[in-house]
């Protein structure tokens, strides 16, 4: 008599659970791929800037699943001080526009300013006015896919370090030896990355509200989109992963604290205690990772993710003037 073979039969409900989890995993990845594309592309359609939220439940669900389209930031304000428009070009032929202005008094150096994601150089004019008042030439730069620069794609700070290098080289070619780099949000991250990538030697850097990593930045974007709490973590992970696949880089290595290890020049780092985009843990990790011993962290108790100058003008001016005076050559 032949022995009957024992067969383990998976219960029907477990198979259904398995299929449900598989479908959910596929849908999460499809949605993450859409978001990865949308968050790295800008569109010139002016209707996007005034678009109203659809009341159609199907349209709202589809938009939530695929992510919103981002309009290109438009420059609405120009300097009232004399300036030259500078046109630079990346290695891949992307046009980069900047404004360069000499101070009215004897120059004490040059401050190059870099904006955050979805912003542009026109939004940095308040800071530029302050630096000029302190006796510094200023250069304001539009990153690729922002303002008047070319390109439709941003890498959220990974490849934008080339723009910092080009602006720094431009100031060197003008004969400047006392160069400070100032950046806000993504601009601060890119400044740190450029020092790491190109071994730049500025007289000092001013970093305002840099995010900790691409993944933490995407978690913040998730919070802004309504995915608060637990969902923001898988959102950050999967969108980071898909950005890397779509753009050809390892997004998980995009960490400001790693770049900070190569920052040996004087550093003034500033952050708002009410910032919901950049958390205190990110700020502390970056600051503690900065290689320079000549560094200072200034916290604005009533500020969120915004212009720290406009939030507390007196405090900002005191800190900026002290830092520049102490570190100018």
Language-model segments: what does each one mean?
Residues 303-313:
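Catalytic histidine-centered segment of alpha/beta-hydrolase-like enzymes
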Residues 262-264, 269-271, 275:
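Short beta-strand/loop motif that positions the catalytic acidic residue
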Residues 14, 24-89:
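An N-terminal hydrophobic leader/cap segment in hydrolases
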Residues 123, 154-174:
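Alpha/beta-hydrolase active-site loop
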């Amino acid at each position: 008599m032949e022995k009957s073979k024992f067969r383990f039969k998976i219960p029907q409900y477990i198979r259904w659970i398995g299929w449900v989890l598989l479908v959910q995993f596929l849908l999460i990845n499809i949605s993450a791929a859409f978001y990865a594309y949308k968050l790295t592309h800008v569109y010139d359609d002016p209707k996007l800037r005034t678009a109203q939220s659809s009341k159609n439940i199907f349209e709202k669900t589809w938009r939530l699943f695929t992510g919103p389209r981002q309009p290109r930031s438009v420059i609405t304000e120009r300097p009232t001080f004399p300036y030259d428009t500078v046109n630079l070009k990346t290695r891949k032929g992307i046009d980069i526009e900047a404004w360069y202005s000499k101070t009215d008094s004897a120059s004490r150096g040059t401050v190059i300013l870099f904006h955050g994601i979805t912003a542009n150089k026109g939004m940095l004019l308040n800071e530029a006015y302050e630096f000029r008042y302190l006796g510094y030439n200023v250069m304001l730069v539009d990153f690729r896919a922002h303002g008047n620069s070319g390109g439709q794609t941003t890498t959220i700070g990974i490849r934008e370090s080339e723009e910092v290098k080009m602006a720094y080289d431009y100031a060197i070619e003008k004969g400047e030896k006392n160069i400070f780099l100032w950046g806000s949000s993504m601009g601060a991250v890119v400044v740190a990355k450029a020092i790491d990538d190109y071994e730049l030697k500025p007289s000092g850097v001013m970093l305002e509200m840099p995010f900790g990593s691409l993944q933490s930045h995407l978690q913040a974007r998730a919070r802004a989109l309504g995915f608060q709490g637990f969902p923001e973590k898988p959102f950050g992970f999967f969108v980071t992963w898909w950005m890397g696949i779509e753009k050809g880089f390892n997004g998980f290595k995009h960490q400001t604290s790693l770049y900070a290890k190569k920052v040996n020049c004087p550093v003034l780092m500033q952050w708002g205690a009410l910032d919901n985009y950049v958390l205190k843990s990110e700020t502390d990790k970056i600051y503690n990772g900065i290689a320079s011993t000549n560094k200072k962290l200034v916290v604005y108790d009533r500020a969120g993710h915004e212009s720290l100058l406009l939030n507390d003008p007196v405090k900002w001016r005191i800190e900026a003037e002290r830092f520049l005076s102490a570190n100018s050559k």
